[in-house]
UniProtKB/Swiss-Prot annotation:
Keywords: Ribonucleoprotein, Ribosomal protein. GO terms for biological process: translation. NCBIfam families: rpmH_bact. The gene is rpmH. GO terms for cellular component: ribonucleoprotein complex; ribosome. The keyword Transport does not apply. It comes from the Bacteria. This is Large ribosomal subunit protein bL34. It comes from Nautilia profundicola (strain ATCC BAA-1463 / DSM 18972 / AmH). Residues 1-44 are annotated as: Disordered. Belongs to the bacterial ribosomal protein bL34 family. GO terms for molecular function: structural constituent of ribosome.
C-alpha cells in the first residue's frame, strides 16, 4: 500500500498557497485568522 503523502511542490502551492487562499472567501478568513494570531507564515 502506498503512503498518502506524495509531496509535489506545484500541488502544495496550488492548494495551500497564498494566491489560492485569496481566491475564496473562506481562504481569506484563514489568512485573517492567521494574521490575527500573529503567524510568521500566513500560507505555504
Amino acid at each position: 500500500m502506498k503512503r498518502t503523502y506524495q509531496p509535489s511542490k506545484i500541488r502544495r502551492k496550488r492548494t495551500h498557497g497564498f494566491r489560492a487562499r485569496l481566491k475564496t472567501k473562506n481562504g481569506r478568513k484563514v489568512l485573517a485568522r492567521r494574521r490575527a494570531k500573529g503567524r510568521k507564515r500566513l500560507a505555504v
